[in-house]
């Protein structure tokens, strides 16, 4: 954040995670999870993402307040926090989702094929990284 300020960078896009919500089923009417769902991470990964979101939000607000006090334009300071989900599943037709027609090339559909008996085993090439 200091480097952003030093180099006159005032916009940041952060790849966060939906894990910041934690167990959304603890609240009524929160599935599917709306953006106004209260934050409540339940693991270290989610807490880390939530903490970074807080740091970004605090920094953007501090810079805006500083510039406002100096009677300078402050609106150019922005932060975007993108909370991704890792959805899996498939449309029953197999046209889209994790049950592709033909040979799958992604890990999740390959694992699904092993689990359902469509494939005997999962081959890992190299060291698996």
Which positions does each model-derived feature cover?
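Alpha-helical substrate-binding/gating segment
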Residues: 87-90, 109-129
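Alpha-helical segments that scaffold the active site and NAD(P)H-binding pocket
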Residues: 2-3, 57-62, 112, 116
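Proteins with a high burden of low-complexity, intrinsically disordered sequence enriched in S/T/G/P/A and R
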Residues: 1-6, 128-129
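Catalytic helix-loop patch of NAD(P)-dependent Rossmann-fold dehydrogenases
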Residues: 6, 11, 20, 25-86, ...
């Amino acid at each position: 954040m200091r480097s952003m300020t030093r180099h006159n960078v005032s916009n940041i896009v952060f790849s966060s995670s939906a894990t910041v919500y934690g167990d959304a089923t603890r609240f009524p009417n929160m599935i599917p999870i709306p953006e106004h769902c209260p934050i409540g991470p339940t693991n270290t990964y989610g807490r880390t993402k939530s903490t970074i979101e807080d740091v970004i939000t605090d920094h953007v607000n501090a810079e805006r307040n500083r510039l406002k006090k100096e009677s300078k334009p402050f609106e150019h300071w922005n932060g975007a926090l993108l909370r991704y989900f890792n959805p899996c599943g498939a449309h029953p037709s197999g046209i889209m989702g994790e049950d592709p027609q033909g040979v799958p090339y992604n890990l999740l559909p390959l694992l699904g094929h092993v689990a359902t008996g469509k494939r005997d085993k999962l081959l890992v090439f190299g060291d698996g990284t």
